[in-house]
Amino acid sequence: LIAHETSHMWFGDFVTMEWFNDVWTKEVFANYYASQIIEPLFPEVNHSLNFMLDYIPAAYSEDRTAGANPVKQQLENMRDAGLMYGNIIYDKSPVILEMLIKKMGKESFQKGIREYLKTYAYGNATWEGLIGILDKYTNDDLAAWSRVWVNEKGMPEICGVISAVSYTHLR
């Protein structure tokens, strides 16, 4: 809880979302960095496994329901802002951020986050603004990736086709 709330000093206070459509951005960083900040204190713990067990089952469980929402939701007026908070934000968004970091590489991601914090210091930012900055540090199309994982509900379906089969037996 302390690590989560401390993360809000940077993601939520130092850089604040432009509108509640992006409220999830401050929560994703708070959840993610809260899970990461304790790693050096407990090197004997399998933090990757704990992260996976804490977030992935809950994210899949929430995201496969008929009433699932995308992580990024549109908000027409402030009176409904409280409806933006929910399991999809607290459970799925850390999984999305972890995927983004793995896609980019930790070093590239950290460079992008530093630029993001510097660019939007004491101001307002959007998710698209962050993706625009992070895009400079990778060859991947992060905008396309974001459309699928952030703006759509549910988990993307992956289909595969086997075109050739071979078998090798080694002794």
Predicted regions and their residues:
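Hydrophobic alpha-helical and helix-loop surface patches within well-folded domains
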Residues: 1-171
